[in-house]
Amino acid sequence: MASALEQFVNSVRQLSAQGQMTQLCELINKSGELLAKNLSHLDTVLGALDVQEHSLGVLAVLFVKFSMPSVPDFETLFSQVQLFISTCNGEHIRYATDTFAGLCHQLTNALVERKQPLRGIGILKQAIDKMQMNTNQLTSVHADLCQLCLLAKCFKPALPYLDVDMMDICKENGAYDAKHFLCYYYYGGMIYTGLKNFERALYFYEQAITTPAMAVSHIMLESYKKYILVSLILLGKVQQLPKYTSQIVGRFIKPLSNAYHELAQVYSTNNPSELRNLVSKHSETFTRDNNMGLVKQCLSSLYKKNIQRLTKTFLTLSLQDMASRVQLSGPQEAEKYVLHMIEDGEIFASINQKDGMVSFHDNPEKYNNPAMLHNIDQEMLKCIELDERLKAMDQEITVNPQFVQKSMGSQEDDSGNKPSSYS
């Protein structure tokens, strides 16, 4: 092994033993070029370091190995990274979260290129757990995990990292990019859409769209298109975006989504035949955007919406009559829709098979059972927790030096602008 590499190994051992992690981070940041020049010796360096005791040194070597234009032996490197992420020291890693996250991004890209996304899911879950200070902290690796789960069509492993509300972002020594934030909410929205959890999907797309921005992001544009479609499926109309949404959404993103706005406009007429014509007219756009499946669900949701409207007018109705009023192909299709809607709790009805009549009923829920009271208690606890968190954030801002300086400056401006009472 070259003497410079020996010195690197000795320094890593010494600084790790002394617990001087900040100096060790400085060393590994400076050593990238040295390690890159000695690629053939890097496995020897790995052999001289202990993954648990010298985690930052091993991280530096693996990062450089993965950074090379071509990886000569991917399987060996994959095994080394897998072993490292599962056994490394989490406390040490948190000093170099930028490099650790970078290694995870490299692994993700390599698996995506090789069309092997499933292999990385378990590894990235371990990586997130090592990086996070708490379960409500968002890291850039969350987006990688969601991407692999989407490509592998294996959604459930991502849910524990999506079902929690994020309160904090891991700064990753300044390396955290807005792209990772947008991708987490965009991919998360797609996962929830695939699982038909449309309420949560809508929230995730909204987070991506309302991210403060000065320029158009392609991720925001695609989120906006899906936001319109999911909004129609879930609510029967496009939910208005919050007032704090960036102006670029109205100025640039909306004009780039004309086909989707037309779809929403026609949807509001409650006319399925017109909606089918519009879908046919813009089918190329919807297919190119990979949104045709959602568009078809919009058409299906319009039939359901029209059936729900019938429940407000009729107590009983024949399946044949329902099919003609809702523009379905016949009583069989009407029966299929009604049964699905009863199963999903969207309507309360029963079908008499003898005469093909549908009887609509009132909602049997009286909101007085223990389960409902428990739900109300849980929602109240969430509100109390949110109130406490807002108070803590308010206090944090109040004592922030930048905020104090700015508020004092504005007060001085105000007092300077006031006319003197003696003039």
Curated annotation (Swiss-Prot):
Q: Which GO terms describe its biological process?
A: in utero embryonic development; protein deneddylation; regulation of DNA damage response, signal transduction by p53 class mediator
Q: Which residues carry this modification: Phosphoserine?
A: S407, S410, S423
Keyword set, alphabetical order: Acetylation, Cytoplasm, Nucleus, Phosphoprotein, Signalosome
The family database entries (InterPro entries) matched by this protein are listed as: COP9_N, CSN3, CSN3_C, PCI_dom, WH_DNA-bd_sf
Tissue expression remark: Widely expressed.
Which parts of the sequence belong to the PCI domain? 197-365
Region Disordered: what ranges? 402-423
Modified-residue entries (N-acetylalanine), positions = A2
**Does the UniProt entry include the keyword Acetylation?**
yes
Q: Where in the cell is it found?
A: Cytoplasm; Nucleus
**What is known about its subunit structure?**
Component of the CSN complex, composed of COPS1/GPS1, COPS2, COPS3, COPS4, COPS5, COPS6, COPS7 (COPS7A or COPS7B), COPS8 and COPS9. In the complex, it probably interacts directly with COPS1, COPS4, COPS8 and COPS9. Interacts with CK2 and PKD. Interacts with the translation initiation factor EIF3S6 and IKBKG. Interacts with ERCC6.
Task: Report the sequence similarity comment from the record.
Answer: Belongs to the CSN3 family.
Chain's role: Component of the COP9 signalosome complex (CSN), a complex involved in various cellular and developmental processes. The CSN complex is an essential regulator of the ubiquitin (Ubl) conjugation pathway by mediating the deneddylation of the cullin subunits of SCF-type E3 ligase complexes, leading to decrease the Ubl ligase activity of SCF-type complexes such as SCF, CSA or DDB2. The complex is also involved in phosphorylation of p53/TP53, c-jun/JUN, IkappaBalpha/NFKBIA, ITPK1 and IRF8/ICSBP, possibly via its association with CK2 and PKD kinases.
Instruction: List the protein's name.
Output: COP9 signalosome complex subunit 3
Q: Which organism is it from?
A: Mus musculus
What is the taxonomic lineage of the source species?
A: Eukaryota, Metazoa, Chordata, Craniata, Vertebrata
Record gene name: Cops3
